[in-house]
Regions:
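Rossmann-fold dinucleotide-binding core
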Residues: 37-99, 108
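A general structural signal for well-ordered alpha-helical segments in protein cores
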Residues: 2, 14, 85, 139-142
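Short secondary-structure transition/capping segments
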Residues: 4, 65-66, 111-115
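Short, hinge-like loop/turn segments at secondary-structure boundaries
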Residues: 3-6, 48-50, 71-72, 117-120
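An accessory alpha-helical subdomain
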Residues: 101-173
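Residue-level "edge-of-site" marker
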Residues: 12, 58, 105
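Rossmann-fold NAD(P) dinucleotide-binding segment
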Residues: 2-45
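Short, basic, helix/turn surface patches
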Residues: 16, 80-87, 125-136
Length: 173
């Protein structure tokens, strides 16, 4: 019998994937996600009847230096199952990650700031850039970042940009 299920599907399918497996899980099985936006997950978890834990490794394959995880962060949602949080604290500590605990709301506010602001700034840069024969270092680095951001999963970008806290953050740009 499973004690923990980690849902790592694309954000678009997180809740539907849970709905597929919940009927076959024991009642005491902890369900968890690693989604980058937590909108609607708190309500889902509270209605699921299962203990839950929610985390967000604040890095991905596009820009993270997987050889230096000590430079990367992870958020563990402070709401939910105590043992599930302990499991992820231990796992992330073993990986050398910097660990922070936030509520669901604090997490989504942080994501609105730390992801949507750079993403929108990159979209603006991409919209106005033109070919440079002799680009400077800053231009080349930002171009590399822009290519990475624009190659992210479209639904992930949509979820980040439609996070309820994003519009207030982007309005400050």
């Amino acid at each position: 019998q499973p004690q923990l299920v980690i849902n790592a599907v694309t954000l678009k399918y997180t809740i539907s994937a849970f709905n597929e497996v919940l009927p076959v899980l024991p009642d005491d099985c902890i369900i968890s996600d690693i989604s980058s936006v937590k909108t609607n997950l708190k309500e889902f978890y509270e209605q699921s009847g299962h203990p839950y834990v929610s985390t967000h490794p604040m890095f991905g394959p596009t820009f993270a230096n997987l050889g230096q995880l000590s430079e990367e962060n992870a958020i563990i949602i402070s709401e939910g199952d105590y043992m599930g949080r302990i499991f992820f604290k231990d796992l992330y500590a073993r990986l050398g990650l910097n660990i922070y605990e936030y509520t669901f709301e604090e997490h989504d506010k942080t994501v609105a700031y730390s992801l949507s602001t750079p993403f929108v700034s990159t979209f603006v840069f991409s919209a106005v850039m033109k070919h440079q024969d002799a680009p400077g270092t800053t231009f080349k680095r930002h171009l590399r970042i822009a290519k990475g951001v624009l190659n992210e999963d479209d639904y992930l970008l949509q979820e980040i940009l439609f996070n309820p806290y994003t519009s207030g953050q982007v309005a400050q740009i």
